[in-house]
Swiss-Prot record:
<keyword id="KW-0489">Methyltransferase</keyword>
<protein>
    <recommendedName>
        <fullName>Ribosomal RNA small subunit methyltransferase G</fullName>
        <ecNumber>2.1.1.-</ecNumber>
    </recommendedName>
</protein>
<keyword id="KW-0949">S-adenosyl-L-methionine</keyword>
<dbReference type="InterPro" id="IPR003682">
    <property type="entry name" value="rRNA_ssu_MeTfrase_G"/>
</dbReference>
<keyword id="KW-0963">Cytoplasm</keyword>
<dbReference type="InterPro" id="IPR029063">
    <property type="entry name" value="SAM-dependent_MTases_sf"/>
</dbReference>
<feature type="binding site">
    <location>
        <begin position="128"/>
        <end position="129"/>
    </location>
    <ligand>
        <name>S-adenosyl-L-methionine</name>
    </ligand>
</feature>
<feature type="region of interest" description="Disordered">
    <location>
        <begin position="216"/>
        <end position="239"/>
    </location>
</feature>
<feature type="binding site">
    <location>
        <position position="146"/>
    </location>
    <ligand>
        <name>S-adenosyl-L-methionine</name>
    </ligand>
</feature>
<comment type="similarity">
    <text>Belongs to the methyltransferase superfamily. RNA methyltransferase RsmG family.</text>
</comment>
<dbReference type="GO" id="GO:0005829">
    <property type="term" value="C:cytosol"/>
</dbReference>
<comment type="function">
    <text>Specifically methylates the N7 position of guanine in position 535 of 16S rRNA.</text>
</comment>
<feature type="binding site">
    <location>
        <position position="77"/>
    </location>
    <ligand>
        <name>S-adenosyl-L-methionine</name>
    </ligand>
</feature>
<feature type="binding site">
    <location>
        <position position="82"/>
    </location>
    <ligand>
        <name>S-adenosyl-L-methionine</name>
    </ligand>
</feature>
<dbReference type="Pfam" id="PF02527">
    <property type="entry name" value="GidB"/>
</dbReference>
<keyword id="KW-0698">rRNA processing</keyword>
<dbReference type="GO" id="GO:0070043">
    <property type="term" value="F:rRNA (guanine-N7-)-methyltransferase activity"/>
</dbReference>
């Protein structure tokens, strides 16, 4: 059973899943596959692959970062809820907000949260560029993004939402270091400073991952993020 595999792998890292948490992951998988038949949530649907490449991959940052306590976490472009929903299951005190530009994914997440009995979660249908200019600007302890765009672009979408003293966690595949060199200029302009990078392998040769931890040192200039689409079309790079 894939849930037993996940439980065993997390136990090796000192994380013990309760029966309730195991049931939540099992329901999560079931709902993901059901809803995926009517909307494109993920290309990964094999049970073991979901447990490895979505659930385990989402939780792995917690091997290097402390998510305990009532921290506020905003997840940008989480799709079907990765990494924030698996993290919320393992760390129930987290206060999670997911911002996604596709309303159908928000509908799935609302249904998922109700079925899993998750509290202190909210799902916002919005563009990150607009959300980052609103009332929740510079209000989150942690902002996460998992491989949704290059780091230069992600920094402009995510750092404006991180409060001073908080952190942006960029979760990347093996090209993270290369992207980091390109993004250093943008990170600095946006008030951030790279703290550290953790590189690790997923089990079963499923690929290399990198977590880049960026401290929010200063407030972000009010001109960022720029209007929707601009960060992607014209990334902040040194001229």
């Amino acid at each position: 059973m894939s849930i037993e595999w996940l439980s065993e792998k997390l136990s090796e890292q000192g994380i013990e899943l309760s029966n309730t948490q195991k049931e939540q992951f099992q329901k999560y998988y079931k709902l993901l596959v059901e809803w995926n038949k009517k909307m494109n949530l993920t290309s990964i649907t094999d049970e073991h692959d979901v447990y490895l490449k979505h659930f385990y991959d989402s939780i792995a940052p917690s091997f290097y970062y402390d998510f305990n306590g009532q921290l506020s976490l905003c997840d940008i472009g989480a799709g079907a809820g990765f990494p924030s929903i698996p993290l919320k299951i393992v760390y129930p005190e987290l206060k999670v907000t997911i911002v996604d530009s596709l309303n159908k994914r928000i509908q799935f997440l609302n249904h998922l949260a109700a079925e899993l009995g998750l509290e202190d979660v909210s799902f916002v249908h919005d563009r990150a560029e607009i959300y980052g200019k609103g009332v929740y600007r510079e209000s989150y302890d942690i902002v996460t993004a998992r491989a949704v765009a290059r780091l230069t672009v992600l920094s402009e979408l995510c750092l404006p939402l991180v409060k001073k003293g908080g952190q942006f966690l960029a979760l990347k595949s093996s090209k993270g270091e290369e992207e980091l060199q390109e993004a250093t200029f943008a990170i600095n302009i946006l008030g951030g400073n790279v703290k550290e990078t953790h590189t690790f392998e997923l089990p079963e040769n499923a690929g290399e991952r990198q977590m880049i931890i960026i401290d929010k040192r200063r407030q972000t200039s009010k001109k960022y993020p720029r209007k929707p689409g601009t960060p992607n079309k014209s990334p902040l790079v040194e001229s």
